[in-house]
Structures are given as C-alpha cells and as structure tokens.
Amino acid sequence: LITSSAASDVYKRQVFNPEVMSLADLLKVFWECHDPTQGMRQGNDIGSQYRSVIFLNSELHKDESLSSLETYQDELELNGYGPITTEISMMKNYFLAEEYHQQYLAKNPNGYCGLGGTGCSFPNN
C-alpha cells in the first residue's frame, strides 16, 4: 500500500514480473475487481483517495493500459454502465503507508472493503 506525495491518497502498489504474469493479465484483474465508472468513490467510500487510477512506472505500459481501458469500456457500455473514470498517468513520488495500513484486510479479516466489481468480464481476444 502506498500514498501519493501530492495528497493523502492511498493506493495499492502492484509489482509484477512479466515472466510470471503479463501486463494484459494484470490489467484484466484490475478492471474486473472494482467498478471503474464510479468517479471519486468505491462503494460507500467517497473522495478523491478512492478514485480508480493506474500509475505507471514506465511509458512502455501506457499504450497497453489505454487500450485495455478502451476494450473494457466497450464491454461496460454493452452492459449498461457509463464511462470509465480511471486516470492513467505516470507515477510520481510515493511513500509507504503507515504499518497499520499495510496488509490491512489480512490483519483485520472482518474489516470493510468497498471494492466490488461490475460483474462484467474483460473480453478475451
């Protein structure tokens, strides 16, 4: 879990090994595990810190990320959802969150998590 330096926003940092999992597979999981059409919220959690965002650490991932957004947008529209509000931009400075926020749901199995997908599967091409 990380926080941005520009504000007190909290994000999930996902490090991946493309030899184990492709960026395409990671993006599929990303789109399916939350509702990217909710703007500044996820479930009952409201505010900019709950917005859907992809921070990239390499320009090499930008085109594939944008393409996946367009693909999933088409699927969402077919199922009655509005536009995706996910921001895709380069990662700037970040700082690790406080220890009590690290692995929060593992430490608090009954803790609240406002994430919920749309039920729309990412199309297989």
List the model feature ranges, each with a label.
Residues 5-125:
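Flexible coil/turn and secondary-structure edge motifs
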Residues 1-2:
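Generic short N-terminal amphipathic or hydrophobic helices
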